[in-house]
Amino acid sequence: DALKKNYPLGLLSEKIIKEITPSIFKDIEVYFSAILSKQGMQEGKNYLSLQIAQKLTKDFLKLEQRLINEATANNKQISLVRKEVDLEYYLFVDGLNFKLSGKADRIDFEGDTLRIIDYKTGKVEGNEVAFTEYDELISNNKKAKAFQLLMYAYLYLKMNPQYQKKEVVAGNFAFKNLKSG
């Protein structure tokens, strides 16, 4: 929630990330103190949980700065288009109406590439989001994250047909293994 609240829509820059960082960390402390007593945040597992949340957030912001710098080096910019996007599309099959829905955490552009991003608080391994056959998405429970990303991309493009000719990338920012890409 601290990221969602503080991240501005529009072009992202290293300067913007540096400017919003103190507010993000302040909000993390506010969220924790709302759940825990002030004294409870100073020791034990509550203290460790707060420290872990701050470390994961710091790592994410470092990654974001690195990605912004890499994009800039390639004459591209990252522009945040939407946050917490409700996705919904009705599919009619054999006279039946099926509602497909989801919620993407972030929609942005890196240059001309539309990126549909889902944040994960845990780990995401590469083999969980990669697939070679569409059947894997249905038959292999370990491909649920890949299915989710594919569904989000499908829903977003159905709701926003103006982007259907764009290059689209769907992926996760997994906070526990950001360094693996």
Which residues does each PLM region occupy?
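Active-site-adjacent bridging/hinge elements
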Residues: 26-33, 114-131, 174, 180-181
